[in-house]
């Protein structure tokens, strides 16, 4: 896997786990980086996020992406469409989220999904809706969808500083083309920190400062060995 794990390694289903965390926490925001669009029916996914938002008192966000782990999908018997189809499914999900969260009920017609009457009751508590975060660096499709639909982007540090900057530049161009204020998009990064390995608090702080200088406003770290810290 991307973070060194195979899909066969022990892991919990994300949204079930987040529902548990909603009852244990009071301030933490709860979401997935990121939800692959192929794994859940779009209307069911939005119902899950709405439910999480209500149960957590308005602390849910929807992190979403076009999915990439073909072996996992095949292993679970889930169809793994072409890249074009997955990105079209991503846009269907984003369009549906914007439409459903703006009303109590909506009909939807997309390229890969349609439904005559999807209800949004109870409404999410987040105002105006749970935050939408799109993960990825694709300059033509992904970042255009960020500019058009999302509240935040998420860019992995593993692509390197130069490509991270290129992604932000592409996002800025899409915002200009769509008439959106670039500053209204939250720029988030994702990386892994091993505080029991080669990483230190000081080196991590230096990375955060470098990300801030590039224009990122929120640094998110995966800490797989945090339980080893004593």
Residue positions per predicted region:
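Active-site-adjacent structural elements that line small-molecule/cofactor binding pockets in enzymes
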Residues: 1-230
